[in-house]
């Protein structure tokens, strides 16, 4: 059997970015043949990605990129908060954000097929899964390229906001921070999605019915609740987070600034996290051992 040297392991690691021990195992299995070892590693890393694909990814990061009037916000997910701080994962996220800005893919599938550092985004993602050992996914992104000014705000790496505006940049940055804190769903009350209004109206109707009030009063209660909700979730109507004596709309008017649109991403929003039941896990392991 050929001797496996440190330089051989280092060379294979440089080619595949795989963990050191995995490289040594592959070289041993390939009897020192570097090309064969590389092929073995590619297959192994791919198998790891396949096994990881079904695992829930509710942690992760939001990354942003702005170049002039082009801006991107992208959410990438992983399984644990620990990996969300991994340098390789963060570097991949930043590169993906920049690639979206430059190449303008239509969706995540198109993005995955684009080339990044000489290989496809999908191949890079798969290799990273093999290296880190967790499922990693690109969940969603938005790209602004309408010619307007842009600012972004990241609260750590878990909340990201992109704001398109005309006017004062400092005021726009304040709005981005406000959006991260108050989480509006639209610019104005008129733009609140119909399904959200219907859901709120249904809740209000149920409460009104339970109150036992006469129909006319109950109807007014429902309408009042809906109008209050619309003000609470529309950006322009919200009390400004840095000065609640004025609304965001009033603050923008005083700053001679117009907000044309915004996007808010919160990591894992809407993804059901897996709740581990330790007792059930132990019971399952005991049962499996007894069968064996």
Swiss-Prot record:
This is Elongation factor Ts. HAMAP family: EF_Ts. Belongs to the EF-Ts family. The gene is tsf. NCBIfam families: tsf. The keyword Protein biosynthesis applies. InterPro entries: EF-Ts_dimer_sf, Transl_elong_EFTs/EF1B, Transl_elong_EFTs/EF1B_dimer, Transl_elong_Ts_CS, UBA-like_sf. Its main location: cytoplasm. PROSITE patterns: EF_TS_2. One of its GO terms (molecular function) is translation elongation factor activity. It is found in: Cytoplasm. Keywords: Cytoplasm, Elongation factor, Protein biosynthesis. GO terms for cellular component: cytoplasm. The keyword Protein biosynthesis applies. It holds the Pfam family EF_TS. Residues 80-83 are annotated as: Involved in Mg(2+) ion dislocation from EF-Tu. It comes from the Bacteria. Gene3D superfamilies: 1.10.286.20, DNA helicase RuvA subunit, C-terminal domain, Elongation factor Ts, dimerisation domain. Associates with the EF-Tu.GDP complex and induces the exchange of GDP to GTP. It remains bound to the aminoacyl-tRNA.EF-Tu.GTP complex up to the GTP hydrolysis stage on the ribosome.
């Amino acid at each position: 059997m050929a001797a496996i040297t440190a330089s051989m392991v280092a060379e294979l690691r440089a080619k595949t970015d795989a963990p050191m021990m995995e490289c040594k195992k592959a070289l041993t299995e390939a009897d020192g043949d570097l090309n064969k070892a590389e092929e073995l590693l590619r297959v192994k890393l791919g198998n790891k990605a396949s096994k990881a694909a079904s695992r829930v990814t509710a942690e992760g990061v939001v990354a942003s990129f702005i170049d002039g009037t082009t801006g991107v916000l992208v959410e990438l997910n992983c399984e644990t908060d620990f990996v969300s701080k991994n340098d390789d994962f963060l570097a991949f996220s930043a590169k993906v954000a920049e690639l979206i800005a430059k190449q303008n893919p239509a969706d995540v599938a198109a993005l995955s097929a684009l080339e990044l550092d000489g290989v496809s985004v999908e191949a890079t993602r798969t290799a990273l899964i093999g290296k880190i050992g967790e499922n990693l996914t690109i969940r969603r992104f938005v790209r602004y390229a309408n010619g307007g000014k842009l600012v972004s705000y990241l609260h750590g790496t878990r909340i990201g906001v992109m704001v398109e505006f005309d006017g004062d940049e400092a005021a726009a940055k304040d709005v981005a921070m406000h959006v991260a804190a108050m989480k509006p769903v639209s610019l104005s009350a008129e733009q609140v999605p119909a399904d959200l209004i219907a859901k709120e109206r249904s809740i209000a109707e149920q409460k009104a019915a339970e109150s036992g009030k006469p129909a006319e009063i109950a109807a007014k209660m429902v309408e009042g609740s809906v109008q209050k909700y619309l003000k609470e979730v529309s950006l322009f109507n919200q009390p400004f987070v840095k000065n609640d004596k004025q609304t965001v709309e009033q603050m923008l008017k005083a700053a001679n600034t117009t907000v044309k649109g915004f996007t808010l991403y919160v990591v894992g929003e809407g993804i059901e996290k897996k709740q581990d039941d330790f007792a059930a896990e132990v019971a399952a392991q005991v049962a499996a051992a007894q069968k064996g």
